[in-house]
Amino acid sequence: MQQSVPDHLVSLRRDLHRHPEPAWREFYTTSRIVDELERIGVDQLYVGKAALGTEHGDLRLAVPDDDVLDEWFEQARAEGAREDVLEQTKGGYTGALAVLEKGDGPTIALRVDIDALPQRESDDPNHVPAAEGFRSEHEGAMHACGHDAHVTFGIGVLEQIKESDFSGTFKLFFQPAEEVIGGGKPMAKSGHLDDVDYLLGVHVGLDHPTGEVVAGIDGFLAVNHFNVEFTGLPAHAGAAPDEGHNAVQALATAIQNCYAIPRHQDGATRVNCGVVGGGTAANIIPESAFMHVEVRGRTTELMGYMKEKAVRVIESAADMYECDVEFTEIGEAPSAESDQSLVDIVNEVAGNSPLVSSTMERDTLGGSEDATFLMQEVQDNGGEAAYVCIGTSHPTGHHTATFDVEEESIDVAVDVLSKSILEIAARRP
């Protein structure tokens, strides 16, 4: 492989890595994106509410409380985020959309995600960001899934498309809040996809080494996250236990029976009660308890099957112990498949790239991603979509404290994605 990653792209990726911001708190990140878009020069630029299409309603999911948003907002301001961008993103309306208009032709879009994870980054001297001085400056947050690289991919591709003989319209979506499956839906329903003929999504790594490209990722599990609150009646645990309605017993029964839901014959189904808690003291019958639940399915219908069964189990557990129960929707994403015509083009382009050492036509994700909202929207409108993997030899898995991206993958991504977009425009499959 020949590698020559431009210095300005490495610098951008490292700046974003130093300043990770979790879902709906990407204030500094959006400001840096706008800086880059204005440097390159685009025909239309939508920021915050304008990118999310809030005139059609606020469809954001899993938005933090105002005090959390305010803390990150002020932190971004202190770190030099632009006041005009802060004004447009205040309240957690992060993200951006750039549009490049270059004459007649199809409308082609690329979607990248921009948020970080609420996770402390390793300070081990063998961890490259720590060793080379771009470890997270935000304790308890890090880019542990490569979204700093994704933003950089997008900027690099935009530069290439602008300088090319591309004919058509190119849209670049910088989507917030993927990690909580909260930002895909509002961007999909923003109206900005209505004229998109072809859409590419991209992810780095996924256990594929640097130099390997997967032309089409499939096997996205549809997912739904929801929170549950049980409310019972407190009582003295020794003197009057019969007077209490035990919310923790309802919780425990719900957990056990959620995991007992029969798996479906038509495909993979999952349930996980990932966060649980309740009670205040050992001598008080617990008045309250909570659980955070996710269900998944190989298709959106199978996810719906698991959701229906889980809700029934939880409601029944609450009834058993005379407790009230309240559900709060947090986030969701449908399943999706990559269209073969686009997979063929990306696979051919990657195979001809001097930066690519190996290709795979397809692979299965086995997880969930809210890029599927955008893919589904384009496909439902008669267009085509595909999700591409750019390999990177990360030392440990995604969502770990020592995750990192080999920066050579930036060059691979920019080359393969930009040339694929040019080829799609030329062929119009």
Regions found by a protein language model. Give the residues of each.
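Acidic/His- and Gly-rich active-site-bordering loop/insert found
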Residues: M1-M142, F166
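Sec/Tat-exported extracytoplasmic proteins
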Residues: R13, H17-P20, G41, K162, ...
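Divalent metal-coordination and catalytic microenvironments
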Residues: L16, L37, L110, H147, ...
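Histidine/acidic-residue-rich, glycine-tolerant segments that coordinate divalent metal ions
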Residues: L59, L117-Q119, A131-M142, D148-T152, ...
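A short, glycine/Asx- and small/polar-enriched loop/turn
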Residues: G92, K102-P106, A222, I284-A289, ...
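Short, small-residue-rich loop/turn micro-motifs
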Residues: V112-I114, N224-G232, A289, I390-H394
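Metal-dependent amide/peptide-bond hydrolase catalytic core
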Residues: A252-P429
